[in-house]
Amino acid sequence: MEIRRADKDDLDDFVRVYVESYRGLEDYAYTRKRDVKNYFKWLLSRDKDGVMVAEIDGEAVGFVACDTNWFSIFERKKVGEIHELFVLPEFRGEGIGAKLMEKALEYALERNRKVAELWVGRTNYRARRFYASQDLRRPESGGSGSE
């Protein structure tokens, strides 16, 4: 597996992997491809170096987006905001998500962000178990439907 910085040429792969990864979790995802494309462009515009793709044999199987320009209302400073982390269902359980998270957190530290944040849907149980397995601590709940 190789993890590299994503760029605008990864748009179609991002859309494909995103849609497949969020199947069954549409309450937490964009459902129209046009919206997913705009979301990818927005992620790149926020922090182009923080968007990374995991590839196996040249095929995109997962993405992570770490935004080090994000101002946290909780921390009252810029943090490494993990906007996205997803892996194709057939590649889950192989450590790809953990490696993507590791790379995102390394990137945040390189940018002098000592705190990382993310939001996860309350009923996205697979993601919640994954983040718990990564020893991420759970802060106070915020918003409705997400933490």
Swiss-Prot record:
Its EC number is 2.3.1.-. Residues 1-147 form the N-acetyltransferase domain. InterPro entries: Acyl_CoA_acyltransferase, Bact_Acetyltransf, GNAT_dom. GO terms for molecular function: acyltransferase activity, transferring groups other than amino-acyl groups. CDD domains: NAT_SF. Pfam families: Acetyltransf_1 (PF00583). Keywords: Acyltransferase, Transferase. SUPFAM superfamilies: Acyl-CoA N-acyltransferases (Nat). It comes from the Archaea. The keyword Transferase applies. Belongs to the acetyltransferase family. This is Uncharacterized N-acetyltransferase AF_0521. It comes from Archaeoglobus fulgidus (strain ATCC 49558 / DSM 4304 / JCM 9628 / NBRC 100126 / VC-16).
